[in-house]
């Protein structure tokens, strides 16, 4: 008889647990998964005699929040996965006035790399952010005669920051592509 009472007690506990679990799930109270959310700040640059930029930093911020974020979630979430490895991007700060350069932005070689290295601290100084080690920066540039639409320095899979230069483009595809380089992804032969 005691054995039967224990079995009934255990069945009641299991039924109660299942009922609570179903209640949580049906009300949308499922456990949250870890999302690797990264911040992208946006600035514009210009120089004397530069043409007008096709878009602006606010448009690029919208593109990041809507299209780039959705693309990266798609790229990094595996079917059946709990989402713990999903990478998400959101816009942080947007500089309201372009940074005026003393000369036209360089497109290739050492001067182009030097520009990428020097614009980052200046942009963050103007944005009022002193620790930008875990932030990405998108720099929107007017047409400078470059053959590329976007450029980024190669990072590593553990990188949590990087700089992307957009050459008169606000393309979500180009931004998402360049962010891939900041993760250490190169080009493939496919």
Feature map (PLM): residue ranges:
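Propeptide-to-catalytic entry region of secreted or membrane-anchored zinc metalloproteases
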Residues: 32-175, 183-190
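Sec-dependent N-terminal signal peptides
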Residues: 13-21
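N-terminal secretory signal sequences
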Residues: 2-4, 17, 30-34, 39
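N-terminal secretory signal peptides that target proteins for export/translocation
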Residues: 1-11
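C-terminal segment of classical bacterial N-terminal signal peptides
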Residues: 22-31
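Walker B catalytic acidic pair
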Residues: 178
């Amino acid at each position: 008889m005691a054995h039967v009472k224990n079995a009934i007690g255990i069945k009641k506990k299991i039924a109660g647990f299942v009922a609570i679990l179903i209640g949580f799930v049906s009300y949308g109270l499922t456990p949250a998964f870890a999302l690797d959310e990264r911040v992208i700040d946006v600035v514009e640059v210009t120089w004397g005699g530069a043409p007008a930029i096709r878009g602006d930093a606010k448009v690029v911020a919208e593109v990041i929040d809507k299209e780039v974020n959705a693309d990266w979630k798609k790229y990094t979430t595996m079917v059946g996965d709990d989402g713990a490895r999903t990478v998400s991007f959101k816009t942080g700060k947007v500089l309201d006035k372009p940074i005026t350069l003393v000369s036209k932005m360089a497109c290739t070689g050492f001067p182009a790399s030097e520009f990428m290295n020097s614009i980052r601290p200046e942009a963050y100084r103007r944005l009022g952010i002193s620790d930008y080690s875990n932030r990405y920066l998108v720099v929107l540039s007017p047409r400078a005669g470059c053959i590329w639409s976007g450029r980024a320095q190669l990072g590593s899979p553990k990188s949590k920051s990087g700089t992307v230069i957009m050459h008169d483009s606000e393309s979500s595809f180009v931004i998402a592509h360049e962010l891939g380089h900041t993760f250490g992804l190169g080009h493939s032969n496919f």
